[in-house]
């Protein structure tokens, strides 16, 4: 398939976080929206449309599925900006491509702009000068609901250090830098394997079953086989993720 892993690749690490997957009624259109916004090239394959990550940036995958669930989703993206003008440009580009503004009660002095993409998924364009996301790249963070325990699980699963651990909130980041993945400290609501957003992990140069056992030993559980060379698993909060052979 020619995947570009691009996220903290290390030959000694089995599980690689290749992408965050989004279910959507129109994978091609939503992938093109994000490809334009992030400056990436979409790659079509048997699992949908992938926007590979590079230079520490987490990949995004768009897969055919039902309409997004109503209400706020448990995961959203944080895009960075280099200046106020750049932030305004990113927002204007997103709206021109089909995004819409979203009022979640945020105050003007907070600085960030909340939007909904054409698939109904929330994301934020963060104000310039945000020290927490400094140097993380255009896709600064994947922000998730989830407990401190699940943040610790993913740190061990990916061999990514905790870069934030305060008041039950956690965040991990590849040793090579790039996109952070963060959890709010609050329990996430699982949809029993039908979550429209999930992590996609690849076992690089190792045994799929052995890696599934390793993750289970860290607190995950097997849900079911999901096709040849794919195992659907759940993290300690019960949130589904896909583990597949390279």
What residue ranges belong to the model's regions?
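Short, small/polar residue-rich loop motifs at catalytic or cofactor-binding pockets
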Residues: 108-110, 226-228
């Amino acid at each position: 398939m020619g995947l570009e892993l691009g996220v903290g690749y290390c030959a000694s690490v089995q599980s690689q976080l290749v992408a965050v997957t989004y279910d959507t009624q129109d994978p091609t259109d939503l992938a093109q929206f994000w490809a334009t916004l992030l400056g990436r090239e979409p790659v079509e394959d048997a699992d949908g449309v992938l926007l590979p990550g590079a230079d520490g940036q987490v990949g995004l995958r768009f897969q055919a599925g039902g309409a997004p669930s109503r209400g706020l989703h448990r995961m959203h993206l944080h895009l960075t900006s280099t200046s106020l003008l750049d932030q305004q440009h990113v927002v204007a580009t997103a709206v021109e491509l089909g995004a819409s503004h979203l009022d979640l009660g945020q105050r003007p002095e907070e600085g960030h702009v909340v939007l909904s993409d054409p698939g109904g998924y929330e994301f934020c364009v963060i104000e310039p000068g945000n020290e927490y996301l400094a140097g993380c790249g255009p896709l600064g963070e994947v922000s998730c609901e989830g407990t401190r325990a699940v943040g610790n699980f993913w740190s061990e699963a990916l061999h990514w250090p905790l870069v934030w651990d305060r008041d039950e909130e956690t965040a991990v980041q590849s040793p090579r830098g790039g996109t952070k993945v963060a959890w709010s400290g609050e329990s996430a609501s699982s949809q029993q394997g039908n979550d429209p957003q999930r992590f996609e992990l690849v076992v690089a140069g190792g045994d799929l079953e052995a890696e599934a056992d390793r993750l289970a030993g860290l607190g995950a559980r097997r849900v079911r086989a999901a096709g040849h060379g794919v195992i659907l698993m759940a993290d300690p909060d019960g949130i589904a993720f896909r583990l597949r052979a390279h």
